């Protein structure tokens, strides 16, 4: 009963005219920042943090502003993924796998509308989980140490091969290239320079924005220039801007499953929406069976990652609010905002600052309604981007990409590296290598190495720690199963389809 009393108190905070306006501004700014390639939620929140403090907003209003920008970015990231095949952030990579093919088939409006509803469902279910189970779930998340996170990363990387069932070998090779890129830079433990080729610009490693813009945006520009004429249109959209009832029913189970998985992944500090969207996409692809068209424009391939990454984003508030541990990079920035107001994140917030905590939770509920109402009517406007002539669209994408990359270090080296990676990505795509496993390998590689180092540091180099807990053992067994079972299943199917299997052939010559 206390929970509902506190929630009503939170709505009293969130429904003040000032906080409603702040939430609306945060939703709009977050959507715009999210659709711009390379910025992402962490940059959006970081940009507005000093502004919130400079405006002397009260702590609950400042947190509402930053949280709504965060959620808005998760909504916005899908737009450029679906329309241009350029993910707004890492969490939107999986959305492009089926969203962009749908756009190319003239179904951009359907993809955008179902992704908005999936984002809404994922967020609302996750917020419900925060309201009902936050303290218990926070205690569960503490069971994950470095060894368990290492096993989780191994499982996620093992799953990458299933992203292209037609050629899992190329998926694994792409993931290995991504893992290799993640090792570039100075080793944090030993100070050794790795694969920098005596270039000081590579000492900090290859930045994520440079990789994602190069491999997706620049390579896409090269493909546009190759396959279309200068004045033509990319695709012709259909008149239907919204999904129909049959498509909604088709995606309902996907949304619910993906929201649940995304929520639990989001609770794990540092796991993030990228892992959640990858795991749910591959889970749904396996559940869909051989007749599904994942990677070719399956609507479930859009619904799954969008429900998961929004559920994960909301779930990441649980460790921040209950343990004082950031659930993601963005919530780490938000924790910095709380310290500016002399508020210590953790379990005492629920008793000492109930207006801040429950005002934030209520604002998240309102923000998701705002974002759904804001995004659905704008589907038609977004799809108009597909009718923009290439003589304008290509320079626009190139300019936005270059500005986003240059903003990281303000060096021309990053621009040259972006172009080089773009040409490399173009060649890989011509050879039918998938880009998403490469990017995910790059993102997961750093986390894999960090958690491996931490685990071995705790055990003084004893590798047994990596499989000492039940969680680690379960995840590693699942990783082995993911790698070994698909080839075995294919072999059994071939043997069943071929009546002349080796041990059943009639003897020759008597």
What is each of the regions a protein language model found here?
Residues 1-60, 135, 139-142, 193-298, ...:
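Helix-loop-helix hairpins and the membrane-proximal interhelical loops
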Residues 59-64, 101-118, 289-302, 329-332, ...:
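Membrane-interface alpha-helices at helix entry/exit sites of multi-pass transporters
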Residues 70-81, 88, 298-323, 327, ...:
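A structural-propensity feature for long, helix-poor, extended segments
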Residues 33-43, 82-93, 125-129, 265-275, ...:
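Short helix-coil transition sites and intra-membrane helix breaks within transmembrane domains
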Residues 113-230, 340-493:
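Membrane-embedded alpha-helical modules
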Residues 27-41, 72-85, 160-165, 260-269, ...:
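Transmembrane alpha-helix interface/packing and boundary motifs in multi-pass membrane proteins
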Residues 71-76, 117-129, 137, 181, ...:
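Membrane-embedded alpha-helical segments of transport systems
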Residues 41-51, 66, 81-101, 132, ...:
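Re-entrant/interfacial helical elements at transmembrane boundaries that shape
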């Amino acid at each position: 009963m206390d929970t509902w009393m506190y929630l009503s108190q939170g709505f009293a905070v969130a429904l003040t005219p000032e906080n409603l306006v702040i939430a609306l501004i945060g939703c709009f700014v977050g959507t715009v920042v999210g659709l711009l390639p390379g910025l992402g939620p962490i940059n959006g929140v970081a940009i507005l943090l000093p502004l919130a403090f400079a405006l002397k907003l009260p702590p609950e209003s400042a947190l509402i502003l930053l949280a709504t920008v965060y959620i808005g970015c998760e909504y916005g990231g899908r737009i450029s993924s679906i329309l241009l095949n350029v993910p707004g952030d890492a969490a939107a990579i999986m959305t492009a796998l089926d969203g962009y093919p749908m756009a190319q088939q003239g179904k951009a409006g359907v993809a955008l509308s179902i992704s908005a509803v999936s984002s809404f469902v994922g967020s609302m279910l996750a917020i419900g989980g925060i309201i009902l189970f936050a303290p218990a779930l926070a205690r569960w998340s503490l069971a994950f140490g470095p060894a368990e996170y290492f096993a989780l990363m191994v499982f996620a990387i093992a799953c990458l091969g299933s992203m292209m069932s037609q050629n899992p070998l190329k998926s694994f090779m792409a993931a290995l290239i991504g893992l290799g890129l993640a090792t570039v830079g100075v080793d944090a433990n030993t100070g050794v320079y790795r694969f920098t080729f005596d270039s000081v610009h590579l000492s900090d490693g290859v930045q994520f924005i440079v990789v994602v813009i190069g491999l997706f945006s620049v390579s896409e520009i090269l493909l546009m220039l190759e396959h279309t004429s200068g004045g033509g249109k990319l695709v012709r959209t259909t008149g239907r801007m919204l999904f129909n009832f049959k498509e909604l029913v088709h995606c309902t189970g996907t949304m619910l499953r993906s929201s649940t998985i995304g929520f639990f992944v989001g609770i794990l500090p540092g796991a993030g929406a990228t892992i959640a969207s990858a795991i749910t996409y591959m889970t749904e692809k396996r559940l869909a069976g051989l007749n599904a068209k994942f990677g070719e424009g399956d609507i479930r391939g859009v619904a799954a990652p969008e429900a998961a990454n929004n559920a994960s984003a909301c779930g990441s508030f649980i460790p921040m609010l209950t343990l004082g541990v950031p659930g993601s990079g963005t919530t780490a920035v938000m924790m910095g905002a709380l310290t500016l107001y002399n508020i210590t994140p953790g379990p005492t917030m629920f008793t000492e600052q109930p207006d801040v905590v429950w005002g934030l939770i209520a604002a998240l509920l309102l923000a998701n309604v705002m974002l759904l109402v804001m995004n659905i009517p704008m589907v038609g406007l977004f799809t108009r981007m597909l009718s923009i002539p290439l003589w304008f669209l290509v320079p626009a994408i190139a300019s936005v990409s270059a500005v986003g990359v240059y903003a990281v270090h303000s060096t021309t080296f990053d621009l040259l590296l972006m172009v080089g990676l773009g040409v490399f990505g173009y060649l890989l795509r011509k050879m039918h290598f998938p880009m998403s496993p490469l990017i995910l390998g790059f993102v997961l590689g750093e986390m894999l190495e960090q958690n491996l180092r931490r685990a071995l540091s705790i055990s003084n180099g004893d590798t047994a720690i990596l499989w000492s807990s039940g969680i680690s053992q379960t995840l590693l067994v699942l990783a082995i199963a993911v790698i070994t079972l698909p080839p075995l299943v294919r072999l059994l199917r071939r043997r069943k389809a071929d009546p002349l299997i080796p041990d059943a052939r009639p003897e020759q010559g008597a």
